[in-house]
């Protein structure tokens, strides 16, 4: 049963496999696997599917079993292990099936088990260098047919080093090699090798390394017993030293000069120099060839072996060879050599660095080098013993250093001007010091031009951004240089500059560097910066802010912006006159804004004007809004009234020499923002009798009051004038001044009093120092106390002022307190007891910040002579009685506490110190809260110790009991636990670079703890992986932060976490901070060279992963444009730089930061000339050579111009057509490219000869400026020589050779492999070094030498015969490479395609050719493939090194470049145009219901068509054979066309919703009688007249009918208006159909058989039939337009029969019908005795005709009842009805009839009842007969195009005249007239 079940399963799997692959099928990793037969071990191979979950089955488990890996709960897996289970040696096969449990898809793999027939060793090289990386050797096993086994995993081998018979010249050669295990190395082996090495077994893969130089042989055999007869595999390895010769290039020397050679060795990647002479190597000069006039007996050069110095003796050449001293090693390895040419000096050359231009700049350092060349321009080695005399004018140059031989000078340019440098090669100095003068010195001169450096003025300009481009302009001045400058702007979006230096602002915000480069040397330039920035701040410039009422103020504005770059540098804008400013006045009525704005000035950019209208001050607000910019500035301005005197209003009283404090009001008030700047200036009427001084008491807060100190110089009266104003200040730099006058009177004093200005302490506690003596006052030693000195007259009245008295101030301790003249007595107005104001004299005492007790005494001894003399008082005057007063002061320091705020970590081991300093020493401390901290004051130390108790905050207040202090000293203490940790770090770092991470610990209020608390928290910072290193730094960002240095050491991502331990011992971690280490970010290619209109894509490598969007930008957008995808398009001639930025967002600031960037250079140029790039000029017949067009430089390759728009066309021609064949690049694939893509061609040599190859490059649009000088075309021509291949004519045999490149290998294969015993050897003689090596397995390998060798292949047949082949092997360098394309594209009519079809996968194969065009059989090149853009094709590596696979994915042109990685000169370019291969080209989107006829010219090789398929048949159903598709649903779909095993292309199709479905009635043309088609209504789905897209073949039209597209639509009908009680479906059948000829849908309408009721209703009421169509089962709304179809139900009579008699000879009948039918209605009678004529016609609604039916012959019916038929018919519609007519004769009994009485008459009169009875019977019979024929007679009538019934054409029109009324064929005649458009019912009889 199991076998039967397995058979059923296999049958099922076979059926599933036969069904074919699905559209998105999964794949296995291998189709067939070959496993070796083993007994001791089991060899496994793992099968893996790309996706899905599978159940696995082996058809023959005894041959190969299958075991799933990683079964899930559904007992399925994606991987399984195949194991060889065969027990007997044989070749058997088992089929492995894998069935997807979800989709049912079945995958298949064949497992073959066979015996190993042969093994061989595979290696990458046969040469090893000492101390180099080891070499991996691998066994490859073959079966008897030469097939390679898939795996040898687990098979045990024995590897041994054996004696090499051919290496006898090497001593102990078997010790030169060592076998390593992978466990000893740093390399990762396969997993099974690791397991075998652990079991001390050797597998199929090993490592070997060289121990010493020599040759060694390695042998491997299978240990499995069954393979004991399999011949072991052997390989011979050569171990060498890596030796270099320095210099390695050819050297040119002068006679008498020398050069020192070095021999170097490479070991482990390091170059070390060998000491020469050496016991291993020696240098030799060979092949000395003297010049034409040289001495053959003398050597050209000599070599000093002890110094390795080569000295040139005479003209000629010689070879320097490095060789082995050991004879046995001389042929084993190849050592470098060099050629030495001894030449005469030809001329001198000058170079300068930097710049390489001889236009220099003063102050710069330059290096000048004089080079020697021979007459062939070969650079001669400048040795130290030559002498070059150089003259550098000291006036222009400062020589900093020079070389001994005079060839190198380091100088500084000093002076502006023009000069010349002279140099002459004069002599050569030999080793003995002898000077050999050249007979003809080599001399040259270099002219030099020197300029001063270029500077631009101004250096910085700033402008605000405005939406209008070019809002601001400025002319920049340049100084220095040659005067001819090239101006440039780094950002044209910010600012542009003209050739004359006129700068214009652009449309973007930012900064632009304006540079002026010297045209003569672009290295020299000057620059300035233009900033176009958003306004950041606005302020008013210093100006006058006070105005008298009625005056105007000008208020200038400064608007500033932030400089870009993040440095927060603020700069004032140069011009903001275009700003739309809004002005607001805070207090209305004080100032009124005036229209207009101030022009820009040196200190402002704009401004406003206001007018003072009333006294007062106000704030003026100016604001600016634009977008997100909101700026505002405020300024305070004031308006004042004229100044007037208040106290005294007119007179003031003072003593002689004293002063009076006068109060004035009005005038300019003290500036509200800076009142201290207020001043009053006073003048007197008589300056000889008074002194004036201004005074501003601090106690006054009335800014309208002004105080004047007037000093009396003589008794009397005086008029005082006062000027009031403010001194200049920051907010009032230009104040106003107002004047006023008052009268002044003097009088003498009598006594003085002195009192302190004292305030009691705030606390109720008293100071211990206070005593009962009120004259003892404690004061602060930091604040100057004031004493109140008063003067009284004899009557005890207080004087206004006494400052003119001679007051002697004394202090008992001047070191503590003193009175300084700089602090004169101040006069303060105070109210006395009477309410009158008196002046108090306040004297400030100057303290000196020292503590102690002192007494201050003030004594008035008289008038102050100095004051009197300075006031010029009049003498003599009465003496003053001495007066005095004193007071004692105690001076102490103010109490201070530090710090004033501290945060304490809540930890028992932490306490904070508050240092209390100074004060009186008597303090009282209290806290705002009692349970947060504990405070203890240590009086001895002056420290308050604070211990944390609970989290919270508390304010500690220190009160000084003995000091007048405004407030106690306070310190706020915060106690907090740890809330969180915060890490700030940039989340990306480039590998090898560093960033800093900052860690803070935050308390409960999110405030940071001090860093000194971190040791109590055990703070640590850790990384999740070791891709970064963390080092704590000692540097501190602040007192709250610890800094770590992060260095990226490996690429990847990790996270940072900081952690601390809290008071409870719990570990608190920060949120992980992600950080990525990324590789360096680079843009490729490094330089982009483009033609105008050409495009190239810039790609990137490295950078952060996953890489965010790269922001591309270009420095000069007028030269080129760059898209977001990196596509660079050339616009104009010039240079630029494309910048690629990788940005990230700073987590803390939210700002975008640049984490990496790179630049590439862009050059947009025009083609000055074209060149044909041909790798060789001589080629052999039958060979091919690629050619392509380039510019005049290497950068001007096809990538630069191949895809330019408008493009170039390339036209190739040869002068001799029979010599060369020109072929397109894709000729082998049957693709013929148009001329615009033919920048690259292939050339085939046909016959020998020489021909010219010419290309003409034409510009499609010469005005686009792509060619130099707006040329229309450029051309180039080369000569190509084609020569015949060398052949033997006698005997006439083919002599072939194997062509190999250096360091390549090939496996030779013969037709006798496996059948005969083959041996290989090289036949070169012992004197010739072979250029190739071959082993016994036929592996032919070439070395680095070029040349030819001969190999011999001998086959020993088992039957005794031997065969020998001798083949020449040529080793030659690769000259060029050529690319071919596959597969070949076949078309129906063999026509060539113009592009690669879209969706196709093609393979490009690279062929390598030598300098004759022959193809290499083996090469060692490593190829690179690149495209100019990546959006049209996808490129990937092919199955071999010389292939690549390209898949076309989009329509467009892509350029492909192929080059050798080691030899960039070996390159080729190809065009890859991609076009649609499937027609038709759809002008617009398809709609549901469209029928599409797809076509393509692509066929198979046999010319057979491929298979069509659709990615979604539910949307677009397609016939697989013909390509007919029907759009069934809305959506996007891909149509595939596939030629099995050959090609596959596709086309994208979009199916949309039709906007409307419109029905249109089709008016038919004239039709014949026999046509019976239904009436049609054309249905247009969508906006097109036809729903058939594309050109359809007859076969496709047949398939369209089979697809039944009409099922997509449904037809509906309805009466309009709906006046009937039955639906239209009871009358009409409406069916959808599709016309394949016209491509149109239509609805076919057929009328049913009508009942009498239906016919009556339809005839009596007017209605229309409306036919519409809709999409079947559509869920979207579409406009439906119906069509009205006219119809007629036919003719209808109001009577079913007519009865006539001789008494009733006439009757009326009314016939209803359509008006167009009734107009031509004909009536026919079946008997001449009955006549009908129209009586009344009505064509209204309903339409009818009334007929009168009468009997012509009165005797009719006298012979018996007459039965006949009236037929009403329409010749237009062929409609007809038949009405039976019966005529009966009745005898009148009232008198004789017209013919007299008769017996028959009497009979009738007697038997009247009988006659009526007979009449009834006859009439009934007639009616029955007519009804029978009407119903049962076969009808030839059908529904015509307008649903009109028609008669058979065989009936005569005169049928009724010749036929009996009772004939069964009594139907209306047929008419040939075509009916009108409409619907008509059949001619059914009415009963």
Curated annotation (Swiss-Prot):
Q: Where in the cell is it found?
A: Nucleus, Nuclear pore complex; Nucleus membrane; Endoplasmic reticulum membrane
Fetch the SUPFAM superfamilies from UniProt.
Invasin/intimin cell-adhesion fragments (SSF49373)
Q: Is the Cytoplasm keyword given for this protein?
A: no
Record carries keyword Acetylation = no
Q: Which intervals lie on the Cytoplasmic side per UniProt?
A: 1830-1887
Family the entry assigns:
Belongs to the NUP210 family.
Instruction: Tell me more from the record.
Output: Recognized by antinuclear autoantibodies in primary biliary cirrhosis.
Protein name according to UniProt: Nuclear pore membrane glycoprotein 210
